[in-house]
Amino acid sequence: CEETGLCLGRKVEKPVKLDGAWKPFADAGLLPDPSSLFLIARAITPPGRVRRFDTRFFTADASSIAHRVEGVIHADAELVELVWVEIGSQPLADAHAMTKNVLAELDRRLATGPLRHDAAVPFFHFYGGKMQKDVLGA
Protein backbone atom coordinates (compact mmCIF):
# COMPACT_ATOMS: atom_id res chain seq x y z
CA CYS A 1 0.00 0.00 0.00
CA GLU A 2 2.86 2.34 0.81
CA GLU A 3 3.85 3.66 -2.63
CA THR A 4 0.82 2.88 -4.79
CA GLY A 5 -2.13 2.76 -2.42
CA LEU A 6 -2.87 -0.76 -3.71
CA CYS A 7 -3.03 -3.41 -0.97
CA LEU A 8 -2.52 -7.07 -1.78
CA GLY A 9 -3.87 -8.96 1.19
CA ARG A 10 -6.50 -11.27 2.58
CA LYS A 11 -9.52 -10.47 4.70
CA VAL A 12 -9.38 -11.43 8.37
CA GLU A 13 -12.25 -12.35 10.66
CA LYS A 14 -10.88 -10.60 13.74
CA PRO A 15 -9.34 -7.13 13.58
CA VAL A 16 -5.57 -7.06 13.96
CA LYS A 17 -3.30 -4.27 15.13
CA LEU A 18 -0.48 -3.43 12.75
CA ASP A 19 1.72 -0.34 12.85
CA GLY A 20 3.81 1.64 10.40
CA ALA A 21 3.58 0.68 6.74
CA TRP A 22 1.29 -2.24 7.67
CA LYS A 23 -1.37 -0.02 9.32
CA PRO A 24 -3.41 0.50 6.08
CA PHE A 25 -3.81 -3.28 5.87
CA ALA A 26 -5.17 -3.53 9.42
CA ASP A 27 -7.42 -0.50 8.88
CA ALA A 28 -8.94 -2.29 5.86
CA GLY A 29 -9.42 -5.57 7.77
CA LEU A 30 -6.57 -7.26 5.90
CA LEU A 31 -3.38 -9.11 6.56
CA PRO A 32 -0.59 -8.74 4.02
CA ASP A 33 -0.51 -11.72 1.63
CA PRO A 34 2.38 -11.95 -0.82
CA SER A 35 1.14 -15.20 -2.39
CA SER A 36 -0.27 -13.31 -5.40
CA LEU A 37 3.12 -11.74 -6.18
CA PHE A 38 5.33 -13.31 -8.84
CA LEU A 39 9.05 -12.54 -9.07
CA ILE A 40 9.80 -11.53 -12.66
CA ALA A 41 13.44 -10.36 -12.50
CA ARG A 42 16.26 -9.03 -10.37
CA ALA A 43 18.63 -6.25 -11.42
CA ILE A 44 21.60 -4.47 -9.87
CA THR A 45 22.57 -1.10 -11.29
CA PRO A 46 26.16 -0.73 -12.54
CA PRO A 47 28.98 0.26 -10.21
CA GLY A 48 30.12 3.86 -10.22
CA ARG A 49 26.65 5.35 -9.99
CA VAL A 50 25.89 7.79 -7.18
CA ARG A 51 22.86 5.70 -6.23
CA ARG A 52 22.84 1.96 -6.81
CA PHE A 53 19.88 -0.35 -6.58
CA ASP A 54 19.53 -4.07 -6.03
CA THR A 55 15.95 -4.44 -7.19
CA ARG A 56 13.49 -7.28 -7.44
CA PHE A 57 10.62 -6.80 -9.90
CA PHE A 58 7.29 -8.39 -9.02
CA THR A 59 3.92 -8.57 -10.73
CA ALA A 60 0.44 -9.52 -9.57
CA ASP A 61 -2.91 -9.81 -11.28
CA ALA A 62 -5.12 -6.77 -10.68
CA SER A 63 -7.75 -9.10 -9.21
CA SER A 64 -5.36 -9.52 -6.24
CA ILE A 65 -5.94 -5.92 -5.12
CA ALA A 66 -7.91 -6.26 -1.90
CA HIS A 67 -8.07 -2.56 -0.98
CA ARG A 68 -7.14 0.87 -2.33
CA VAL A 69 -5.87 3.64 -0.06
CA GLU A 70 -6.81 7.06 -1.42
CA GLY A 71 -4.43 10.02 -1.33
CA VAL A 72 -1.16 8.05 -1.61
CA ILE A 73 -0.37 9.25 -5.13
CA HIS A 74 -0.11 13.02 -5.52
CA ALA A 75 2.20 15.77 -6.74
CA ASP A 76 4.45 15.62 -3.65
CA ALA A 77 4.61 11.82 -3.36
CA GLU A 78 7.11 9.33 -4.78
CA LEU A 79 4.54 8.48 -7.46
CA VAL A 80 2.56 11.34 -8.97
CA GLU A 81 0.39 9.17 -11.22
CA LEU A 82 -0.62 5.52 -11.40
CA VAL A 83 -1.82 4.28 -14.76
CA TRP A 84 -2.47 0.89 -16.33
CA VAL A 85 -0.93 0.40 -19.76
CA GLU A 86 -0.40 -2.54 -22.08
CA ILE A 87 3.09 -4.00 -22.34
CA GLY A 88 4.73 -2.57 -25.46
CA SER A 89 2.33 0.35 -25.70
CA GLN A 90 3.37 3.90 -26.61
CA PRO A 91 3.32 5.24 -23.01
CA LEU A 92 6.19 2.82 -22.26
CA ALA A 93 8.34 3.97 -25.20
CA ASP A 94 10.35 6.30 -22.95
CA ALA A 95 10.71 3.84 -20.08
CA HIS A 96 14.18 3.04 -18.73
CA ALA A 97 15.97 0.25 -20.63
CA MET A 98 15.90 -2.09 -17.62
CA THR A 99 12.17 -1.50 -17.18
CA LYS A 100 11.72 -2.48 -20.82
CA ASN A 101 13.83 -5.63 -20.27
CA VAL A 102 11.70 -6.65 -17.31
CA LEU A 103 8.44 -5.96 -19.13
CA ALA A 104 9.67 -8.03 -22.09
CA GLU A 105 10.41 -10.87 -19.66
CA LEU A 106 6.92 -10.54 -18.18
CA ASP A 107 5.43 -10.59 -21.68
CA ARG A 108 7.37 -13.77 -22.54
CA ARG A 109 6.24 -15.46 -19.34
CA LEU A 110 2.60 -14.50 -19.86
CA ALA A 111 2.77 -15.90 -23.41
CA THR A 112 3.61 -19.36 -22.03
CA GLY A 113 0.55 -19.55 -19.77
CA PRO A 114 -0.28 -18.63 -16.19
CA LEU A 115 2.54 -17.23 -14.07
CA ARG A 116 4.25 -19.73 -11.77
CA HIS A 117 6.16 -19.17 -8.55
CA ASP A 118 8.77 -21.76 -9.55
CA ALA A 119 9.70 -20.12 -12.87
CA ALA A 120 13.33 -19.27 -13.62
CA VAL A 121 14.15 -15.61 -12.99
CA PRO A 122 16.59 -13.45 -14.98
CA PHE A 123 19.23 -11.63 -12.96
CA PHE A 124 20.66 -8.56 -14.72
CA HIS A 125 23.98 -7.27 -13.38
CA PHE A 126 27.31 -5.90 -14.52
CA TYR A 127 30.37 -8.13 -14.62
CA GLY A 128 33.65 -7.17 -16.24
CA GLY A 129 32.16 -3.86 -17.33
CA LYS A 130 29.32 -5.46 -19.30
CA MET A 131 25.66 -6.06 -18.59
CA GLN A 132 25.10 -9.74 -17.99
CA LYS A 133 21.92 -11.76 -17.74
CA ASP A 134 22.07 -14.88 -15.62
CA VAL A 135 19.08 -17.10 -14.97
CA LEU A 136 18.31 -18.02 -11.36
CA GLY A 137 16.50 -21.25 -10.63
CA ALA A 138 17.02 -22.73 -14.09
Residue ranges and their predicted role:
Residues 18-138:
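Nudix hydrolase/Nudix homology domain
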